[in-house]
Amino acid sequence: MSFTFTKSDGSSILFAVSKNFEHIRGFKNAIDCFKGKIEFLSFDKVDPTKHDYYLVAEDERVSDLDIPKGFFERNPEFRHKMLKIAWITQCIEQGKLLPTESFEVELNQDDVNRTHDGFRKRELFTLEDEKILIDHVHKNDINRFGTKVYEELARKYPQHSLESWRQHYKYMKKRLPPVSDSDESNYCQRIIVKPYSSQKDYTQSTHEQTLSSPISKSASVSKSENKALVNNKRYSDSYFYFSKMRRISIDVDYVDEDLNLINAYLSQFGKKRSLNELCALLSRRFSNRHTFSEWRALFMHFFPFINSEGVDPAILSDRETSAMLDETSDNEVADIDDQMIERKYLFSASEPNTVKSTNRLIFSERKAYAADDSIDNTPSKVPIVNSLSDPRTNRPFFYSNPDSMYRSISNPLHLVDSQHLSPLNRKTHFNNPIGQPQFTCLDDHEKTLRETSFRSLDDMSLRKSNSDNIFVKPGEDLEIPLLSDYSDSENISEKSSDDEEAFEKQVTSSYSSPIKVKSQGKSSKGSSGLDVREHEGSDDDAEVFVDRSPESFGATKVAHTSLEGNAASHKKVEENMQQPVTKKQKKYRMVNEEAHTGPTIIIPSDNNEKVTTLPAGHVPSEEKGKFINLAMHELQNEVSILRSSVNHREVDEAIDNILRYTNSTEQQFLEAMESTGGRVRIAIAKLLSKQTS
């Protein structure tokens, strides 16, 4: 045997090993083979006079060892006798005793100071300790984010550690005023509040409120009210600081009740009182919440366009520049209104969006919609009035981006300018900066439906403005030019007259009675969707009746019939609403209506044969999709009302129109809405698909 774990005098080396090695099989036998001795025990059982070394595992932390208090102070040489277990392994592999310097466990100062109870207890900070922080850190205005200043404090004043000094100053900094570089006398005045002491000295030592603008006598704070302000202490600590011109930052602490109070007072007195008067009223009645300057900072932060100049009212109006209330009735009105405001806004959560209403009041007084945008190079904003007005303000929405129209057609209120948002939502709405309109991406299917609706805005406005002239009058003859196979009524030649162009738009609207179209030849081909019924007459002439009634227009696809015949001899189609219907025609209609209970879909044939009328159960999927798209176009106004309107009568009428259109009951519509998660469009499509299936 080449070497042994023995000393120079021949005695065996006694190792003290952590108990973590006790479960390792063969570890004790390996040391015994080389004449060493081993004991498994914790560090607090180590005897420096008896044990030669203490072995620690490679991954074992010194913080897990139970080091007795003051152990290394009494036995400083034992710091070099704590070895890693790799020393035993390397000695056995190399067959000799290796130096221990490279295998010593590194100990920092915290490990040396560690006791079996953990780190030393943190002492409580006294008033003298906080004076030290103010004199050495706060007044000097040095770099307070480093650690050198706190290291110096920990060395001079060892009652607290470096981290304790640093953390306590962070806590104090929230209540300390900023240091004035120009005038040291304007620094701060400390006020010590002694428990169970009289308030006389305390009241005399408080600073007087200084207001930046003059306040009327009715809104001034008296001495008794100032004493009440002092008695309602806002701080629970034993001391706090005041400054003459206290600057409140934007991130001042506030709660939702504070915003409700601001909104309520601004709505009630905004057009009669100035901003300073409002702040004085709030600070007098709710002195335990905020001071005058804090209320003013909250007003300026959440309502940046409020009038803060002089004694003018906070909300200026062009037509309404009423004078201040008389001093005799001012206090009485204020007391009555304050009680109402407290009950409605402060102690009740029934009005969560009160700030939004005040924002609309302030922004409505601004000339936001004036034509002042022509100076810059931004795109001009064109108002869209057709069913796109804000029901809350009765004002049209303005768009500078044409793509935003797709979103506004189905839900006009979805495109919200951040100016109309409440202060609570202004910071988080879509995570976008203030003043930029918000948009939402659409999928391909929804965008296709929106595009179809967007193209029909002109027809919607035409039907609304020319409702008196939309139907054909008795005795009036209409001439329709022949249409080709690939044309429709929306693309009539641009060379037509003004009357023809007006009729071109009217042809897409619904009529109260069917149109009788007389053409040459046997056949007439409908473009996939019009309820076209051919009269089986002679071989020379064929009469085709196009059902333009509101029932047929709502239940079938609106398409424009393509008529073919002898174009050389017949170039015009005559149409007469007054021509009586023969008995044979009525009989044909009755038979056709009995044969088809559901909506009638017309499939055009390839050759010049009769138009095939299929029942709803045999509708191809392509024609079925076109029919649903058309239905979405017709029910566009009802969908918009259900999404945005708050008028119960309008909502009821919209639901009734949808039920009549889809030929369904209220229970079926309710089940469709529940199955689609409240999405109106998908629910209507689901009801229509049941009709054609």
From Swiss-Prot:
User: Does the entry annotate any disulfide bonds, and if so which pairs?
Assistant: none
Q: Which domain of life is it from?
A: Eukaryota
Q: Which cell locations does it reside in?
A: Nucleus; Chromosome, Telomere
* Cited SUPFAM superfamilies: Homeodomain-like (SSF46689)
Mention one GO molecular function. telomeric DNA binding
Q: Per its UniProt record, what Pfam families does this chain match?
A: Myb_Rap1, Rap1-DNA-bind, Rap1_C_Sp
Q: Which GO terms describe its biological process?
A: meiotic attachment of telomeric heterochromatin to spindle pole body; mitotic telomere tethering at nuclear periphery; protection from non-homologous end joining at telomere; telomere capping; telomere maintenance; telomere maintenance via telomere lengthening
Keywords associated with the record: Chromosome, DNA-binding, Nucleus, Telomere
Domain named BRCT is located at 14-105
Q: Name one GO cellular component term.
A: shelterin complex
What biological function has been recorded for the protein in this entry? Answer: Involved in the regulation of telomere length, clustering and has a specific role in telomere position effect (TPE). Unlike yeast, exhibits no effect in transcription regulation.
Similarity comment: Belongs to the RAP1 family.
Instruction: State what protein this is by name.
Output: DNA-binding protein rap1
Species the sequence originates in: Schizosaccharomyces pombe (strain 972 / ATCC 24843)
Q: Which gene encodes it?
A: rap1
